[in-house]
Amino acid sequence: LHDSTNISRIQHYTMNLYKELEAETGQGCGIFQPGSLYLAQTEKRSNQLQLQAAKAKLYGMNFSEINREHAEELHPLVDFTGIHTIMWEPEGGNVDPSGVTAAYAAGARQRGAEIYRFTKVTATIQQSNGSWLIETPKGNINSQWVVNASGLWAREVAKLAKLDLPLLPTEHQYFVTETIPEIAAQGRRLPSVADRDGEYYLRQEGNGLLVGAYERDVRFWAEDETPAEFGHELFKDDLERIEENVLRAIDRVPVLSEAGIKRVINGPMIWSPDSNVLFGPVPELKNYFCCNGIIPGFSQSGGMGLLAAEWIIEGEPKYDMFAWDLTRFGHWANKQFTKSRVGDQYANRFSIHFPYQERAAGRPVRLRPVYQTQIKMGAVMGLNYGWEHPLWFSDKPNTVETNGFTRQNWFKPVA
């Protein structure tokens, strides 16, 4: 599930699509659905999970609170001491990325799509009738639309159309352990565990565990441009950066302390300033569509593809995509702002995102002449298309807005 209702719908659709893909193409997607456990160590995290459970019930999704005894039956290797709330998602799981990619390709070819691998795009030129000429070393392609879904190379492809996208890659690492006897002895696949207060995630991989974290020490990569020759090689291992996260994971799953590390994966992922996808048609260009910066890619890819098709063919998607529309950022979202916000988003990936919360990173960007006057009057500022603007006025200057799922310090002044 996701804090956003529409993203939850997209993810739900995507997981169901993978089953349809397998049946239709005969290509396995490597679907594992042993369920997922979500843990809350604090009252506010409990509130967040309870809010998600209420949304799940409204939209017919299976996500509910369970007691400790039930959780221990589901995952006997987890120590649930100190956990306030445990949520259970029976359909939670993961897929095999290579299998899903192959299934998408097979399904597309069955419907007449042509796929050109290892073919660099050297130019995208808009024609007088609104169509596009795409130049490659292997020949030119004429297309009514261009869809930029270029992953790590989204910025470079966008620049071919004189478009700047506020995106920046970071390093991200996780590791897979050797076989853990206690897991092998279970005779079944164990649920994944999301302990966001502990700032790590883990799931079964073979008869071991896959453990990952979003550390506070963010490491940026390819800040100016992604090298054309980059072939998804891995970076040097640097597990010391996630040592604290791993120690918390060991406290929660003690068998992890005796496990050897089988392999470490340290690779890039590309982020937008608010970690949401840059999605939708580009206003300045006719028939040019972007779908870039999808951090949880394989849990959202199918839904994003559906909405992109709807938007292109029918003129609008079925869901409100305002929060993901790429036009939420303009030229004011420069490199400095993007780097500051991406660093903040990465480091706080597992922090609670409260309703109406405003992030301070990268601000201020644009100030109106009345800014200082408003501050002296007690204005609590928010960000709106790069501009600092008053959200509400306190009875004293420099008031810091509180965040939570109950009434906060803005309630009385606004009411």
Stretches found by the model and what they are:
Residues D197, G206, A228-R366:
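C-terminal catalytic lobe of FAD-dependent flavoproteins
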Residues F32-S36, T170-E171, V264:
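Short Gly/Ser/Thr- and Asp/Glu-enriched loop/turn motifs at secondary-structure junctions
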Residues Q126-S128, F322-A415:
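Basic, glycine/lysine-rich polyanion-binding surfaces/domains
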Residues L1, T5, A123-F235, E244-R252, ...:
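Flavin-dependent oxidoreductases
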Residues M87-W145, A149, W153-E156, G302:
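Helical element adjacent to the flavin cofactor pocket in flavoenzyme catalytic cores
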Residues K44, H75-I83, I125-L133, W271-S275, ...:
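A short, glycine/Asx- and small/polar-enriched loop/turn
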Residues L1-L74, D197-L202, G206-L210, G343-Q357, ...:
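Dinucleotide-binding Rossmann-like beta1-alpha1 core, especially the glycine-rich loop
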Residues G28-Y38, Q52, E72-R111, L133, ...:
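Helix-loop-beta segment of a Rossmann-like dinucleotide-binding subdomain
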